[in-house]
Structure formats: C-alpha cells, structure tokens
From Swiss-Prot:
It is an enzyme of class 2 (transferase). Pathway: Amino-acid biosynthesis; L-proline biosynthesis; L-glutamate 5-semialdehyde from L-ornithine: step 1/1. Keywords: Amino-acid biosynthesis, Aminotransferase, Cytoplasm, Proline biosynthesis, Pyridoxal phosphate, Transferase. The keyword Transferase applies. This is Ornithine aminotransferase. It comes from Bacillus cereus (strain Q1). One of its GO terms (molecular function) is ornithine aminotransferase activity. Belongs to the class-III pyridoxal-phosphate-dependent aminotransferase family. OAT subfamily. The modification N6-(pyridoxal phosphate)lysine is found at K255. Its cofactor is pyridoxal 5'-phosphate. It catalyses: a 2-oxocarboxylate + L-ornithine = L-glutamate 5-semialdehyde + an L-alpha-amino acid. Catalyzes the interconversion of ornithine to glutamate semialdehyde. Pfam families: Aminotran_3 (PF00202).
C-alpha cells in the first residue's frame, strides 16, 4: 500500500502550491475519526471547515448518495429532475424564504449573491447603471473567486490578480457607525459573516446584527448573511444570525448543505429579490443536480433528526468553559458559539497544531495565531472530553 510520505511527495511534485496542509494523509474516515495509510487514527477537529457537521460518511447520507447514483446523477438544468423540487421546498422552509437558487461551491453562491444584489439595485432600487456598491467587512472571507477576493481586505489574496471588482466598500467588522457612514444611494447590499471564521472566530458585539439589519431596512439596502461556514447548526443555532434574532434578506449557504459528501450551495431570498433573474441570466450545469439534491435532503434531515444544533450548543458551552480554565498566559482569549471555537494565542498557532496532531487531534491554525476547534456535530461527550484533555496537555 502506498505510504504517507509517498503521497505527500506526489502532491508536492505535481500539485500547485496553493495550500499548506499539515503533513498527514487521510485515507479513511467515519464519524469524527480519520485514519492515515499506516492505520494511525486521529480525531477531526476541523470538519473540512464545517462541511462535515453531520460527521464523515454518515450512513443516511451515503445511502442517499448510492440510491440516487443508481438512478440518475446529472440532467443539467435543461430538464427537470425529481430531486430538485423537493430540495427547493426543504431549503425554502428551513430559511423561511420564498425562492432558492442552487450552485455548487460556497464561492459560487457568493458570486450569485453579488449578481443578485447588483441586479436588484438596478432593476428595483433604480441605482444608476454600473454604479452599484456593496459594503463588506475587514478580515472577511467569502471565497477565492474574483468577486470574493475583490471583497477581501487581505492583500495577499489579491496580489497579482488585479484589477479587482469595482464598487466594493470595506468597513471594520461590527462597527455600526461605519456602516451608517458607508451607505450611499448606490449601496446595493451589506454582505457579512455573522461570525467571521477565517479571521479567527470573530464574534460581533451583541446586538450588532440586529441593529445593522435595521439600518439596512431603513436605507433600502439588502442585508446578506454568508452562513456558508456558520450555518446549519455549527454555532448552536440553525443559523448564526439566530443569535441576534435576525432574518437576513438573503442567506448564502454551502459546506454542510452537502453533508461532507457532495458539493452543493445556494442563495435563498424572497421573490422580490431573487425574482430579478429570468431564464438565461444566471446558471450552472451542475447546480441543483439530482445527486447533490438527494444528498442535501438527507444531510438536512440528519441535522433535524439527530438534533445536531442542540448538541452543538450544549457541547460547545461546556468545551468553551473548560478551555477558558486552561492556565497559560500564552492564551489571550477563548471565544466561540456552539462548536465553532477559537483559541487565540500571543504567538503562532501552527506549532501547537502540529503538537496536537502528534497527540491524535487534527485542527488548523487560522489568522496565524488562532487554533480553530470545530469538530463534527455528531461528536460524543466522551470523545469531546478526550479531545479536551489532549488540548489541555498541549497548551498547559
């Protein structure tokens, strides 16, 4: 059997150097556990950036995949499929929105949200042609496509890719007065993550989302929540916006929408917003394909049936409390909602992620000095306690 070092060598030889992974190869996975080619087992505390909320290879989701793969996998949108309509209904009811537009990856859904907001601004708000603006937040992460990196404040994400998309206005995260000052008659939308993930699990001030939504409604600006990473139970609520009792004008969903098995994403909004599209104005050959829809329906059913949102809230509160008790001045803050947790250090986090790997835990540094803890929501209390003891041993 091919070994870890051989696979990494092949990757380094032939793969574009656009990632810096920990030196581990995963060849098997189930639930919260993964295994390398040599048979070493590790607990997954990253969940593929929250795409695996339901756990690796959840039986119900895998069975849905196999059943659908044995019938039909792709029709394109030139024809109807028997899975798309039921999936539309499932997501519309989950988000309490009237319409859903399917894509494949989170970044594609972000691009779709940008296009939706711009067209809405021109067709409904009557902004002058080619003058629409979109407000975003510093340290955001909305993906790697041109629209998404144009919204980023990280210059390394932009280097060598210019010119950027015009009409982007960047404000500090969680700053209500900056939002008010940034809005002009040309503002189409305010796009934000309810909790910033890649920036280090940044949580806005309590009440900010609600106040920002009120400002947007007053100024006729769309409030768009990127819940790709925070949605579907990760933060202990179905959506992170729920922490402020906020229903955005538009949701952007992805990652766990496919149960860690098949990529599917979408935007969801009411008809007065998504109704700006007509046939031919936007699309995707694979978007809303029957295989993805069947998997997604099962993934959403697992979240509901196994009460994973409630588990995330309960287990997350306990783990955050435990982590805050670790006595080490190197730890400057522990923050999080549900099982979406950041441990901020006053030094680089990667060496500690490597030590955690040696102890049997897989997690990844984010924003240089933050260890992100985000296990699959199916994790047992016993396994989470085991993980905490390992983390405590490394960080104490």
């Amino acid at each position: 059997m091919i070994q870890t070092k051989d696979i990494i060598e092949l990757t380094d030889t032939y793969g574009a150097n656009n990632y810096h992974p920990l030196p581990i190869v995963i060849s098997k996975a189930e639930g919260v556990w993964v295994e390398d080619p040599e048979g070493n087992r590790y607990m997954d505390l990253l969940s593929a950036y929250s795409a695996v909320n339901q756990g690796h290879r959840h039986p119900k989701i895998i069975n849905a995949l196999i059943d659908q793969a044995n019938r039909v996998t792709l029709t394109s949108r030139a024809f109807h499929s028997d899975q798309l309509g039921p999936w539309y209904e499932k997501v519309a009811k989950l988000t309490n929105k009237e319409m859903v537009l399917p894509m494949n990856t989170g970044a594609e859904a972000v691009e779709t949200a940008i296009k939706t907001a711009r067209r809405w601004a021109y067709d409904v708000k009557k902004v002058e042609a080619n003058r629409a603006e979109i407000i975003v937040c510093e340290d955001n992460f909305h993906g790697r496509t041109m629209g998404a990196v144009s919204m980023s404040s990280n210059e390394e994400y932009k280097r060598g890719f210019g010119p950027m998309l015009p009409g982007i206005v960047v404000i500090p995260y969680g700053d209500l007065e900056a939002l008010k000052a940034a809005i002009t008659p040309n503002t189409a939308a305010f796009i934000l993550e309810p909790i910033q993930g890649e920036a280090g699990i940044n949580i806005p001030p309590a009440g900010f989302l609600k106040e920002a939504l009120e400002v947007c409604k007053k100024e006729n600006v769309l409030f768009v929540a990127d819940e790709i990473q925070t949605g579907l139970g990760r933060t202990g609520k179905v959506f992170a916006c729920d922490w402020d009792g906020v229903t955005p004008d538009m949701y952007i969903l992805g990652k766990a929408l496919g149960g860690g098995v098949f990529p599917i994403s979408c935007v969801a909004a009411n008809r007065d917003i998504l109704g700006v599209f007509e046939p031919g104005s936007h699309g995707s050959t694979f978007g809303g394909n029957p295989l993805a829809c069947a998997v997604s329906i099962a993934a959403l059913e697992v979240l509901e049936e196994e009460k994973l949102t409630e588990r995330s809230l309960q287990l997350g509160e306990k783990l955050v409390g435990q982590l805050k008790e670790i006595d080490n001045p190197m730890i400057t803050e522990v923050r999080g909602k549900g099982l979406f947790i950041g441990i901020e250090l006053n030094e680089p986090a990667r060496p500690y992620c490597e030590q955690l790997k040696a102890a049997g835990l897989l997690c990844k540094e984010t924003h240089e000095n933050v260890i992100r803890i985000a296990p699959p929501l199916v994790i047992s209390e016993e396994d989470l306690e085991w993980a905490f003891q390992k983390i405590k041993a490394v960080l104490s």
